[in-house]
A protein has these predicted regions:
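Beta-strand-rich binding/interaction modules
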Residues: 554-578
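Loop/helix patches that line or flank the sugar-binding groove of alpha-linked glycan CAZymes
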Residues: 45, 49, 256, 260-284, ...
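C-terminal beta-strand-rich structural cap/linker in extracellular carbohydrate-active enzymes
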Residues: 583-604
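Acidic/aromatic-lined carbohydrate-recognition and catalytic surfaces
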Residues: 25, 30-233, 237, 250-324, ...
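Classical eukaryotic N-terminal signal peptides for Sec-dependent ER targeting/secretion
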Residues: 1-22
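Hydrophobic residues within beta-strands of alpha/beta enzymes
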Residues: 91, 243-245
């Protein structure tokens, strides 16, 4: 629900505070120059995903092929050439399964079929086939924590049918002193309110850590574990190259005590709102050790499948808005492989806040980078997630002047890049009115506070052109309003421009293919408050520098000593705010940078 299900709306603000505390604890304190180095084992055989470009599509908002105002699979297929031109390696699709859409696909009624408004299984098979022809891989969202209450499994569990009695987490609850029925514990759901809901037919409460219509599956029941592994195998058989696992931390809860009672979670002290998820510390419902083991089991299933069926390695990407020490466990341990890519959300939870980092100094950027690279287990690959369908868009969170810089960072740093659709053209948030809101995280609140929780602003339809509805749909209306800035911020206009966010993104794509960026090491530093400097280097290959003024005041910097470089470099990529031209000479001991200017230069 995720990428994050999450978060702040549901991802409790509390979890982000914890992550930020850990981020600061793990990082160096700011100084004139905050340094870090990341080394890659270029001598080892590298797999396809280790320097891949992943591209997240929110299907409802990407491309509408049939004019109903909602994006669909055929629409995605029709735009595959655009993704190929972006040099995308793998396309990750947010949920497309059969769903009543209480949480836009994260409430799954049938894990083995396609939501009709998105298309059919034939449409999906065609998408995979056409993508593979272009050299693109398809990754699916895997939503293991819960199903829809309209799923047949839940209906059978309600009826206590044999084999399904404990598919979900059920409890009788209690009677208080006045005789009124009360839930089994004080646990809260991500979308506000109790995590327990009374079911009249079964005469018990069921656990739902997300919406009422999203009952939690019971992973302490072996049949559930086996069933969800069948789900993975089914889609592997249909040609998917891997899975992004949604809302991982919630899969297991503590067992009840010997009397059958679940423990109440302690108060967090972060808010006085008793319905807000961050009102409690979720020590009994999230981040349990059993969840890590479950991820290891899923990785083993993927590896076993690859050994039997051949082909490229299938990949596992996990979403966990958890403390860093817990997230790092998903990589694996000395004896067991875990996810290839536990998502790195440090550019989202780090900095000043998850909502506004427009004045983050260079030392803040270095801390964010270091927090992952310094704590990642050796022998593993980093990944960089700047945004997703649950977060404010990068340009709205870091500032429009930093759009190109954030794309530069994502492409320039060592490891895997993961782009949320629209970031390559600089799409920004659209404020959605209470009346137009569709996100349950917002709709479960009220008109006075919904903006604290809504994820709709980053989910507006993709902007293809300056024609009606941004070229997304022929319908007179779309499921969410389209950002009026589509007139200038769109693929067609930016492709035709001599310089745009998209042309810069494509330059970064080309640079990323160089051996230095594929295999080279990295060093990074902050010079004062303004300048972020990153070096990528590899023996016998060109050296590249990313030099960025992250603030709104001009500055001149000497990067020669801190990056251990000398002489002149040639300018090869500049952001929209730079007045430099390609080929301009840059002397590393005297680099003037305008407000928010970012450049990439190469050794002569």
């Amino acid at each position: 629900v995720s990428q994050a299900v999450l978060q702040a709306c549901f991802l409790s603000k509390m979890r982000k505070i914890i992550s930020l505390v850990l981020l600061l604890a793990f990082s160096q304190q700011p100084s004139l120059a905050c340094d870090g180095t990341a080394r890659q084992s270029s001598g080892d055989a590298r797999e396809w995903w280790q320097s891949a470009q992943f591209y997240q599509i929110y299907p409802r908002s990407f491309m509408d092929s049939n004019g109903d105002g909602i994006g669909d699979l055929a629409g995605i297929t029709s735009r595959l050439n655009y993704l190929k031109d972006l040099n995308v390696t793998a396309v990750w699709l947010s949920p497309i399964y059969t769903s009543p859409m209480a949480d836009f696909g994260y409430d799954i009624a049938d894990f083995f079929d396609i939501q009709p408004e998105y298309g059919t299984l034939n449409d999906f098979d065609n998408l995979v086939q056409e993508a593979n022809k272009l050299g693109l891989k398809v990754i699916l969202d895997f939503v293991p924590n819960h199903s829809s209450d309209e799923n047949e499994w839940f209906k059978k569990s309600v009826r206590r049918e044999r084999g399904y009695e404990d598919y979900y987490v059920w409890h009788d609850g209690y009677k208080n002193e006045s005789g009124a029925r009360v839930p089994p514990s004080n646990w809260l759901q991500a979308f506000r309110g109790s995590a327990w809901e009374w079911n009249e037919e079964r005469q018990q409460y069921y656990l739902h850590q997300f919406a009422v219509k999203q009952p939690d599956l019971n992973y302490r029941t072996p049949a559930v574990v086996a069933q969800m592994k069948r789900v993975l195998t089914y889609w592997l058989d249909r040609g998917v190259a891997g899975f992004r696992v949604d809302a991982v931390p919630w899969c297991f809860e503590v067992l009840p005590d010997e009397t059958g009672r679940y423990p109440d979670e302690p108060l967090s002290g972060y808010t006085d709102d008793p319905d807000d998820s961050s009102y409690l510390l979720h020590i009994y419902t999230q981040d349990l050790p059993e969840t890590v083991d479950m991820v290891y089991q899923w990785r083993k299933l993927l590896d076993d499948y690859q050994r039997i069926h051949g082909g490229d390695r299938r990949v596992l990407l996990t979403e966990a808005w958890s403390p860093l020490d817990y997230v790092m466990k998903f990589y694996g341990n000395r004896t067991t492989e875990g996810a290839q890519m536990p998502f790195n959300f440090q550019f989202i939870v780090g900095g000043n806040s998850d909502k506004n980092n427009t004045d983050l100094p260079a030392s803040g950027f270095v801390k964010i980078i270091s927090s992952w690279l310094d704590n990642m287990p050796s022998g593993h690959t980093a990944n960089w997630v700047m945004g997703n369908h649950d977060q404010r868009r990068v340009g709205s969170r870091y500032g429009e002047g930093r759009i190109d810089l954030m794309n530069m960072l994502q492409m320039f740093l060592p490891g895997v890049s993961i782009t949320y659709m629209g970031e390559e053209i600089g799409m920004t948030d659209l404020d959605i009115s209470w009346e137009d809101s569709r996100d349950p995280a917002a709709c479960n609140s009220n008109a006075n506070i919904y903006e604290q929780f809504t994820r709709d602003p980053a989910r507006t339809p993709f902007q293809w052109s300056n024609t009606a509805n941004a070229g997304f749909s022929t319908n007179s209306t779309t499921w969410l309003p389209i950002n009026p800035n589509y007139v200038t911020v769109n693929v067609q206009t930016e492709e035709a421009a001599s310089k745009s966010h998209l042309t810069i993104y494509n330059q970064l794509v080309a640079l990323r293919k160089t051996k230095t960026l594929q295999q080279g090491d990295a060093s990074y530093t902050a010079i004062g408050d303004n300048v972020l400097a990153i070096k990528r280097f590899l023996k016998d290959e060109k050296t590249y520098l990313l030099l960025a003024n992250v603030l709104d005041s001009a500055v001149t910097a000497d990067v020669s000593d801190v990056l251990r470089v000398s002489g002149n470099f040639n300018t090869i990529i500049t952001n929209m705010l730079s007045t430099r031209k390609e080929g301009d000479i840059v002397s590393v001991n005297n680099v003037p940078l305008g407000a928010y200017e970012a450049i990439i230069v190469e050794s002569q």
